[in-house]
């Protein structure tokens, strides 16, 4: 018997949208059927057509008439924080679950290794994947905060300039706000701060992340180390290139962890781990929601949410 698949649409045919499309094509329970853009000449739409995916260059409005006809139940938005609210409203009204890869953060934050099961149980109609820096670093903040209270969490995400598209560059302020908010809300730090560094070095450098946590009490080295290694294993289930470079290094009440993220090389080269962790997390999230839909435990209702 053939496994039934949940049909999906992707909005935004840029770096992230194209990489995500390649991952979804390998999924046992997700089937990408539409790619939505705004430029009929875009390389992303052309590539999608060559892969046998239906395309529209009329934005989300060009997709709406086909949502019911093609049975679309999940949409991924890889456009910009500025347009996400309207995209989400239009698709939620038709009973489509939205996975938000922009920093808009209309729906609850989702970091699969930390809180995916909780978000699936809540049956949210819009979940936000935070940012690439958030996906790479928040698991480490959470790994420390589940051992003991963290008064301050600071993350620095360093990414190759070549891997950062125009959408991300336009959203730098939203990136820092959304990531620092999620360091607090999902990571468990009482106060969070996020910094992104776009490195123009050639050849391009792999994504690197530095995480600093200030603990309220004296750090417990053995427990923190065990928690960090357990969390890394969880992230590696969907991002195999997630690696500890150094740490946890403890200096007074400061716990520092140094990570690197290598991508699978689906669309962009392996140095673009910042894209890979975002698209892999989004695909993992959608698969868990799809399992609930297929099992009949989550029924998508039209106009389930008004944004």
Swiss-Prot record:
The catalysed reaction is:
acetaldehyde + NAD(+) + CoA = acetyl-CoA + NADH + H(+)
- Tagged with keyword Cytoplasm: no
Where do the catalytic residues lie? 132
* Entry keyword NAD: yes
List the InterPro entries hit by this protein, alphabetically: Acetaldehyde_dehydrogenase (IPR003361), Acetylaldehyde_DH_C (IPR015426), NAD(P)-bd_dom_sf (IPR036291), Semialdehyde_DH_NAD-bd (IPR000534)
Q: Name one GO molecular function term.
A: NAD binding
Q: Which GO terms describe its biological process?
A: catabolic process
E.C. code: 1.2.1.10
Question: What are the binding positions for NAD(+) in this chain?
Answer: 163-171, 274
**EC class (word):** oxidoreductase
SUPFAM superfamilies in alphabetical order: Glyceraldehyde-3-phosphate dehydrogenase-like, C-terminal domain (SSF55347), NAD(P)-binding Rossmann-fold domains (SSF51735)
Kindly state which keywords UniProt assigns to this record, in alphabetical order: Aromatic hydrocarbons catabolism, NAD, Oxidoreductase
- Output the Gene3D superfamilies linked to this UniProt entry: Dihydrodipicolinate Reductase, domain 2, NAD(P)-binding Rossmann-like Domain
Q: Which family does it belong to?
A: Belongs to the acetaldehyde dehydrogenase family.
Q: What is this protein called?
A: Acetaldehyde dehydrogenase 1
